[in-house]
Curated annotation (Swiss-Prot):
Motif extent (PRPP-binding): 99-111
The enzyme's E.C. designation: 2.4.2.9
Family under the similarity heading: Belongs to the purine/pyrimidine phosphoribosyltransferase family. PyrR subfamily.
CDD domains: PRTases_typeI
Top-rank taxon: Bacteria
MF-aspect GO terms: uracil phosphoribosyltransferase activity
Name of this protein: Bifunctional protein PyrR
Organism from which the protein derives: Akkermansia muciniphila (strain ATCC BAA-835 / DSM 22959 / JCM 33894 / BCRC 81048 / CCUG 64013 / CIP 107961 / Muc)
Annotated HAMAP family: PyrR
InterPro entries: PRibTrfase_dom (IPR000836), PRTase-like (IPR029057), PyrR (IPR023050), PyrR_bifunctional (IPR050137)
């Protein structure tokens, strides 16, 4: 349960509505192209799996994949601890596919830059789009989402995304200081 001292940005039903809107946007744009929805480990993959399910409910087939970007980060040598490596799961070729990369929170854009580098190691997609549940603003690189669940105007605020599959509940909160 979310402590009352935290600002609730989205609750479970709010996350569900946001993902529904994102799925409708994905389906409406570029219909007929082969589609893969690829989540960034560790929360983007959960969101991506839900988006695949919602897109399928709308009558569009989409392949699911997940990608670990740990070794592609530009701050890997500045980290105090070694990143924990997880296996990417892309059981299909991304060549000539429309790939929607999915992350939980978009902030500086550096994570997505790393994800693009990782994705190109798997092939040459026809088109890459970006979906994020939360857009925090604060870009340091020129990356913008194509599909967004919620835009925050709390520049620099820490955001915690919890997903039922990994954390037992769906919520997006801003912790109090």
């Amino acid at each position: 349960m979310t402590p009352p001292s935290q600002e609730i940005v989205l609750d479970g039903p709010g996350i569900s509505r946001a993902l529904e809107r994102m799925a409708h946007g994905i389906v409406a744009r570029f219909p007929g192209e082969p589609l893969a929805i690829v989540g960034l480990l560790s929360q983007g993959d959960v969101i991506a799996r839900r988006l695949v399910d919602k897109v399928k409910e709308l009558g569009v087939e989409a392949q699911y994949g997940s990608i670990d970007i740990s070794l592609y980060r530009d701050d890997i040598f500045k980290l105090e601890a070694r990143p924990s490596l997880r296996s990417s799961n892309l059981p299909f070729s991304t060549d000539d596919m429309r790939v929607v990369l999915v992350d939980d929170v978009l902030y500086t854009g550096r994570t997505i830059r790393a994800a693009l580098n990782a994705l190109f190691d798997y092939g040459r997609p026809a088109r890459i789009e970006l979906a994020c549940l939360i857009d925090r603003g604060g870009r340091e690189v020129p990356i913008q989402p194509d599909y967004t669940g919620h835009v925050l105007d709390h520049a620099g605020a820490k955001v915690i995304v919890s997903m039922k599959e990994a954390d037992g509940e769906d919520s997006v909160v801003i912790p109090s200081h």
